[in-house]
C-alpha cells in the first residue's frame, strides 16, 4: 500500500519509536545478564521481566505499522535499533532505564498532541488510543524506576 505524504511522515515517526522499543528490549536483556552486586538476582529478575514487556511493545508497534499499511519487509528501519549503555552497576542500569523510559513518555505525549493529527479517521483515533496505552505503560515504568532508585 502506498502511503500519502502525511501518513508516510507519521509512519517514519512510528518506525523511530519501534527502534526505541527494540533498544529498550535489548538493553533490558543485556542488563539481566550483566547486572552485578549483592542484589544481582533480584535485579536480574526485574530486568528480564522488563525485557519481556518490551518485546510485547515491539510486537504491538510492528502490528500497528502493518495495520497502517507499512510493509516491514521493505524497510531497514524495521530491523534497526538505537544503541544503549553497557554496565555492571545496578544504579547506572536503573538510571539509564529511567532516562530511556522518560524519553519515550515525552515522545508518546508529542505523538498524541501533534503527529497523530496527520492521519485521517479512523486511523487517527486508533493511533491516539494506541499511543495513550503506550504512554500509560511507559509512565508506570518511570514511576517504578524512580521508586527503585530511591532505595539503592
Regions found by a protein language model. Give the residues of each.
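Disorder-to-helix initiation segments
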Residues: 1-17
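Short, charged, low-hydrophobicity "junction" segments
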Residues: 1, 45, 79-84
